[in-house]
Amino acid sequence: MLHSGAITSTKLERESGIATEIMEQAGLQAGDTLLLSSNSGINTVPVEAALYAKEKGVFVVCITSMQATEQLKSRHKSGKRLCDVCDVVIDNHAPLGDGLLTIPGYGQVTGGASTFGSLYIAQRIVLNIENRYLKDGLRPPVLASANVPGGDEFNLQLVQTYQDRIKALR
């Protein structure tokens, strides 16, 4: 939602009903796994996304800051936070306010800890899944760089295989 701008994004992530629209477009199916990331874990959209996915039989994993979420009240009508509705909760250890540095003399924080922590965690999950494929004697379905010889051809095969399930590939 950040593509709409920071102020609009903040308003949208607190509105009910948006998550349902997004999740319906995703085409989730029972047995899928959904990874959600929300540093505070208190806004309506991520909580609704998790609840929607669970109703569909999807396994839901979230990355959140337990330090932040434990100090804040949910904005979801149920009063639940993201960590309350997910199957697995991974703590990104970001501090309340999400800043790594305090601006001297002003008290504001900067350097989004959740950006660094959550991206690292998500990439580790991907690497672990790829290793699981390899241990099972399978080739992980990973796109090649389009800027290396044969990359486009290899990627076309993967796109054709997965485009019905992953709309972003269409």
Question: Where are the regions a protein language model picked out?
Answer:
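Glycine-rich phosphate-binding loops that contact phosphosugars or nucleotide phosphates
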Residues: 1-126
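YjeF_N-associated NAD(P)HX repair module
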Residues: 104-170
